[in-house]
């Protein structure tokens, strides 16, 4: 993405900020969440909601695409069973948003929603989506925008917990290519990004071992991976809090 786009679209999505502009964005965000939550509480037919979200996810207007990503996040929280049932459609829309060619806000919202959705489905049945998500997330670890880097580290750490046997070889290669980024951002200029990086580094450390005698995977690391999975499924917001406060 060129510098002009980043100047226009990459202005602080920041991790927390108290600027007046953020308050206006938060207000719009609040009403958006309420709107989608009411739809699910009224039990509006899911196919209708998915149709609306699918249309908005591909709309030329970036604000509508952003709303679609947010709506999918609300769906994951309010109707996780439905998301599991229609996960291929949901994942397809989120990956589409993750690769948005213009809007950093759409990409950011997609990453946050993917963190919730992957937790609800416990990383099962991702198929080739695992590759798509991993490749794009890895490129965002070095993004100049603090919020994008933060969300990318959270999501990448989650992917480490869900790689499993099927994607172990692929993910090991991705982690090795990411090693420099992991080391650099341990000292990230943004303290919250640095904390998220440290937690993700621990989650990825088993994939960095070269020989058995240099294994990073202690008994504590194995317990942490199980804990990542449980929190990711039941309380993704707590998982993000732990990342932010270096509790794991």
Curated annotation (Swiss-Prot):
Cellular component terms, GO, for this chain's entry? cytoplasm; nucleolus
Where are the stretches annotated Disordered? Answer: 1-20
Species for this entry = Macaca fascicularis (Crab-eating macaque)
> Could you tell me the keywords of this UniProt record?
Nucleus, Repeat
Q: What is this protein called?
A: Protein maestro
Q: Which gene encodes it?
A: MRO
Q: Which InterPro entries match?
A: ARM-like, ARM-type_fold, HEAT_Maestro, Maestro_heat-like_prot
Q: What is its main location?
A: nucleus
Start and end residues of the HEAT repeats are 44-79, 128-163
């Amino acid at each position: 993405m060129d510098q002009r786009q980043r100047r226009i679209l990459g202005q602080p999505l920041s991790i927390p900020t108290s600027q007046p502009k953020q308050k206006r964005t938060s207000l719009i965000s609040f009403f958006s969440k309420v709107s989608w939550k009411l739809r699910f509480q009224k039990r509006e037919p899911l196919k209708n909601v998915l149709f609306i979200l699918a249309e908005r996810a591909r709309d030329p207007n970036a604000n509508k695409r952003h709303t679609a990503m947010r709506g999918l996040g609300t769906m994951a929280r309010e109707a996780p069973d439905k998301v599991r049932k229609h996960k291929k459609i949901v994942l397809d829309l989120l990956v589409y948003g993750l690769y948005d060619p213009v809007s950093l806000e759409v990409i950011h919202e997609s990453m946050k929603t993917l963190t919730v959705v992957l937790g609800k489905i416990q990383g099962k049945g991702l198929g080739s989506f695992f590759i798509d998500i991993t490749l794009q997330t890895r490129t965002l670890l070095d993004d100049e925008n603090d919020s994008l880097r933060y969300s990318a580290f959270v999501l990448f750490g989650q992917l480490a917990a869900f790689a499993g046997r099927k994607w172990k070889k692929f993910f090991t290669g991705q982690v090795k290519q990411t090693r420099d980024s992991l080391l650099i951002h341990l000292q990230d200029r943004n303290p919250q990004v640095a904390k998220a990086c440290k937690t993700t580094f621990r989650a990825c450390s088993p994939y960095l071992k070269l020989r058995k005698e240099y294994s990073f995977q202690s008994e504590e690391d194995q317990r942490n991976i199980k804990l990542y999975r449980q929190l990711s499924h039941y309380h993704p917001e707590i998982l993000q809090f732990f990342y932010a406060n270096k509790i794991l």
